[in-house]
Amino acid sequence: MKPSRRRRALLAAATILALTGVGAGPAQAEPPPDAPEQIDNGDFSTGIAPWFSYGTGPLGITDGRLCATVPGGLANPWDAGIGQDGVALTAGAEYTLAFEVSASPGTPVTAVLQLGSAPYTGYASVTVTAGGTAQRVERTFTVPDDNPSAQLIFQVGGSADEQTACLDNISLRGGEPPEPYEPDTGPRVRVNQVGYLPGGPKNATVVTEATGPLPWQLRSASGAVLASGSTDPRGVDLASGQNVQSIDFSAYRSPGAGLTLVADGETSHPFDISGTLYDRLRADSLQFFYAQRSGIAIDGELLGPQYARPAGHLGVAPNQGDTDVPCQPGVCDYRLDVRGGWYDAGDHGKYVVNGGIATYQLLNAFERTKTAATADGGTALGDSTLRVPERGNGMPDILDEARWELEFLLRMQVPAGRPLAGMAHHKIHDRNWTGLPLAPQDDPQPRELHPPSTAATLNLAATAAQCARLYAPYDAAFAARCRAAATTAYAAAKANPTRYASPTDSTGGGAYDDSNVTDEFYWAAVELWLTTGAPAYLADLSASPQHTADVFDPSGFGWQGVAALGRLDLATVPNALPAAELARVRASVTAAADEYLTELGRQAYGLPLPGDAGSYVWGGNSNIINNAVVLATAFDLTGDARYRDGAVQAADYLFGRNALNISYVTGWGEHAAQNQHSRIFAHQLDPASPNPPAGSLAGGANAALQDPFAAQLLAGCAPMFCYVDDINSYATNEVAINWNSALAWIASFLADQGEAGAVPRATCAVTYTNHGTWHGGTGFTAQVTLRNTGATVVNGWAVRFAFTGDQKVREAWLAKVTQAGATVTARNESYNARINPGGTVTFGFNATTGGGANPPPGLVTLNGTRCASS
């Protein structure tokens, strides 16, 4: 087990005792006046970040100073501290540490400059007795070692009485000025470093000063020329500022490995052409969620020994959560057990709104397999397809993983009998920010529930409604819990429609504020109607302004804008909308997809995102993927290969066809991101800590540069260059569950496309007739008629479809019918195996249902091929 932060401070203090007379004494010469500053935001003019604390009350800014309340009775100075990570030090260089400090009523404060990871070597320290009046402290010293990621800690514990400690004008001058940053962009021919599907689009981008067409060659691993042609000049690309040309080698369709493109004297990174390119990515992108689990020990035999760790936040010291968590002061008078769920991103917080969209996308990736012709009935997402502890339990593994978060979301609901009962607490996280690295089991911070919000409550309502229909075939009791929680949450949100999370509630965790929840109301109403069929929810969604609005933003949907989630489900999940209304809903999806295709064609790097700076935002890679999700959904709805090809081409950007020539997915591509901002995966800072697991998506280029590291390093960057693979850049290089959920969705779609060949024409038509209910609505009788619309005889048939919820076939006639989960398979009897062209076959069944929505299935296949509805 790694030492806790408290233990690290103790180790550093012990080491510094040996250094005090050597490098930390006052006899050192000061660095020159123009020496570079190594501390970010030392005057707190931009707020609290990147400062963190442990063992104190929340950090706050008072009269321009950074202040915290320190509890009395702490045994040691290092039991509480305020600090900053990522301080760069140069061996042999002289530094001057300066700061102003005060404490009331008064206590010793020790400033410690130390190595930020094992063995936590201390470089210098100075102890002063701080009182009510601020005093200025300076100390000059020499550093013996190079260290790009040292740590400055102000130890403020050890007093018998409660203290208020304040710091200001913190400076560490010295060392070498950073060299101008020049990213290593590799060869000027930019390709999808993973590769291309044989029948899919194959495009690359060449960065060049040439303005006329250039010859290109596709070469095998041995150097043989496989194809050739001329580039298409595109001029200066807005997003990158580069003069670029395009290569289209889509006509080459043969599989191969280790291929390269050569143009303008440059050879690309190698790539493959294969119909199985993305099969492993489907699993890798989902494995990320197991690695992010809270409240369970991570099994190294499942994920790899480097990722094994004890359970975090199960009430075992030094953890102070999550089995008995209080609210922030003044918020509530109860405590909740909110164990489990996923750690949200690079921190140890858990947030309902971000957990909501992430859970939705995993559940939707599974639900898509019921209606998408290329999904093969969801076999690739079934039981034992992931390395999770629950594998082999009879439930699809993707549902096992989503359930880990759903159980947490349910625990965040305010209990009955309490004020705001039925609403959901917005989030739970540490009282103060912590530094990096920090394993979950080593987090010493108090944990707090934050006030309930309407947005969080509606996220719970929507995802719990999804849960109620999708888990019903596997765990009826859990599905019933979800349904009850969803209906209760929706009613509570309607009773409290304007409880917004505070945008300033960002100490110790992200604010995730949202003051427009019309989209959340729409999404929740859609999910509840799809699950229950209750007219009240249909009335609410129909009356929502979002129902007829353009909900597909050019820059993509995300946690703060979720109307698109409702629209996509309304378009794809079978339901009882009138035909004209359903056609309008689906047309809105294809219209948005058309716009994304147009944008993709405009962009020289071939992505469905505008090239202006405002479109490159925090987590922007997920926005690009979410636009690809719309394209993919349009393909599922229509079978139009243009939409499939657009979604496939959008993936090229993620895997290296971009200005930086980097794959943003760890472990995928010749040159891939690996130093994402994370307290758990912090190998850059601590060699004993792993890099993020393969399949982890980096946030991506972010023109706003909201972290100090990126702001200093990348100032003036063209939008597509506003990224650095460094753990200190949380604004461009964090991991997050809602980003990986988008990746998991599109990875599953891409894997389903195989070789991306011609879309088969339907050679059958199906009529599904529900003849009505019996036994008080708990049973129904249905009939399925298939017509052979092709030109050849069908000799032996298997028909497959999936129910939306808990429907269960009890008996059938004219076919041999079996059911696994929600999926029904009907096979011919010996006497009706033959269906002549133009001929029909009919079978029927009786089934039970719990009384929710019971629409006809959205997809019926005959021998694996989609049938048209008639």
Give the residues covered by each predicted segment.
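Extracellular and organelle-lumenal recognition/adhesion modules and their flexible linkers in secreted
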Residues: 30-180, 862
